């Protein structure tokens, strides 16, 4: 046990030193000097932005210092326990600290300004007809369960039902680092299974696309003029055209220049649906223009490959064997039931590691 504790301590101290040696500590000190200036609050919007930026950076270092102190305390307890030949309970405490270490390691991979923000997650059905719509419903449940496991909150923004499942769905996932974690899910997801909709019990392949955008807070200004958009209202409807209500409460917003379309029909209030659709539009415009400016990264518009065979980032195979495999990181898990119940943390962690090296 002593050796395991010392190894964990060494790893934690190595990460802490790397974080302090890079520009993080210098930026924290720079923000601290700015905050202490007499005229700091003359520009409240700028002041709030600085405080949030400093808080995000501190949250990358302070928890490591706390963890290191806890591991050192456990190391001292281990020596006492071994001398008294009573090590009961040390394993439980070690496992708790090891999990904290893994969680903090994941957070250390986040580099982008909005990684700590909430996220909009959208799933669209691809090739596969009814089977593909059922696949969207399965993924919707998977991400909802993931959010539940993380103690994140979710809000339904838009849902278009279809025979056998869901044609498309957009949800907001609210929680710290929701965007930073879930952007690993962007891409084509492939399902291979014996279709419950096929009387001949043949094997079918279906596709769905997942897109993730950061929720833009008030500290980032995205200006949208009335003449830049077209707003359409329509009746919210369910599968087969069944009306959820008889008023035109659903809202669709089209950004004319980019062609980006957002919509919401989750609320009975047209005003609320308009606000939600506008909120999603701001997030997608931020990502659109950001990717346009960044020549090193491909625009999301360029990465929207055809939702079909050969472009998938991850495959979920239920027949003839059980396996979920990420084609980017090569990480795989044969427990498909667990994965579909939202246990995708390992896939996300492996992606973040892979992304940091590529």
UniProtKB/Swiss-Prot annotation:
Positions of modified residues (N5-methylglutamine): 242
The record's account of how the chain is modified after translation: Methylated by PrmC. Methylation increases the termination efficiency of RF2.
A cellular component term, taken from the record's GO annotations: cytoplasm
Miscellaneous field: The gene for this protein contains a UGA in-frame termination codon after Leu-19; a naturally occurring frameshift enables complete translation of RF-2. This provides a mechanism for the protein to regulate its own production.
HAMAP family with a match to the protein in the record: Rel_fac_2 (MF_00094)
Transmembrane segments: none
Gene name of the record: prfB
Function of the molecule: Peptide chain release factor 2 directs the termination of translation in response to the peptide chain termination codons UGA and UAA.
Any one GO biological process: viral translational frameshifting
Xref: InterPro entries: PCRF, Pep_chain_release_fac_I, Pep_chain_release_fac_I_sf, PrfB
A molecular function (GO) term: translation release factor activity, codon specific
Keywords, in A-Z order: Cytoplasm, Methylation, Protein biosynthesis
Family: Belongs to the prokaryotic/mitochondrial release factor family.
PANTHER family: CLASS I PEPTIDE CHAIN RELEASE FACTOR, PEPTIDE CHAIN RELEASE FACTOR 2
Stated name of the protein: Peptide chain release factor 2
One Pfam family this sequence matches: PCRF
UniProt-annotated location(s): Cytoplasm
């Amino acid at each position: 046990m002593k050796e395991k504790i010392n190894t964990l301590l060494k790893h934690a101290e190595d990460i802490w030193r790397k974080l302090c040696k890079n520009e993080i500590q210098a930026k924290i000190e720079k923000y601290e000097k700015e905050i202490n200036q007499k005229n700091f609050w003359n520009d409240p919007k700028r002041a709030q932005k600085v405080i949030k930026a400093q808080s995000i950076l501190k949250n990358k270092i302070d928890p490591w210092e706390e963890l290191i102190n806890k591991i050192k305390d456990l190391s001292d307890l281990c020596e006492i326990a071994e001398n008294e030949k009573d090590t009961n309970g040390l394993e439980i405490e070690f496992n708790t600290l090891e999990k904290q270490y893994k969680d903090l390691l994941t957070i250390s991979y986040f580099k982008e300004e909005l990684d700590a923000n909430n996220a909009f997650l959208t799933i669209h059905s691809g090739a596969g007809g009814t089977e593909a719509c059922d696949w969207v419903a399965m993924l919707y449940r998977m991400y909802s369960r993931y959010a539940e496991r993380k103690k994140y909150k979710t809000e339904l923004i838009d849902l278009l039902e279809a025979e056998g499942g869901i044609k498309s769905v957009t949800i907001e996932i609210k929680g710290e680092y929701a965007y930073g974690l879930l952007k690993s899910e962007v891409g084509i997801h492939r399902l291979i299974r014996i279709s419950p909709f096929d009387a001949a019990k043949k094997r079918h392949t279906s596709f769905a696309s997942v897109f993730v955008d950061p929720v833009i807070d008030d500290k980032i200004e995205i200006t949208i003029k009335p003449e830049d958009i077209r707003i359409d209202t329509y009746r919210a409807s369910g599968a087969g055209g069944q009306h959820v209500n008889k008023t035109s409460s659903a809202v669709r917003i089209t950004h004319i220049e980019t062609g980006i379309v957002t919509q919401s029909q989750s609320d009975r209030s047209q005003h609320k649906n308009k606000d939600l659709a506008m909120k999603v539009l701001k997030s997608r415009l931020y990502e659109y223009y950001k990717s346009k400016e960044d020549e090193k990264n491909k625009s999301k518009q360029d990465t929207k490959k055809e939702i079909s065979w050969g472009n998938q980032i991850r495959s979920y195979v239920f027949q003839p064997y059980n396996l979920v495999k990420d084609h980017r990181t090569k990480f795989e898990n044969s427990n498909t039931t667990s994965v579909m119940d939202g246990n995708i943390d390992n896939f996300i962690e492996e992606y973040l590691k892979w992304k940091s090296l590529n």
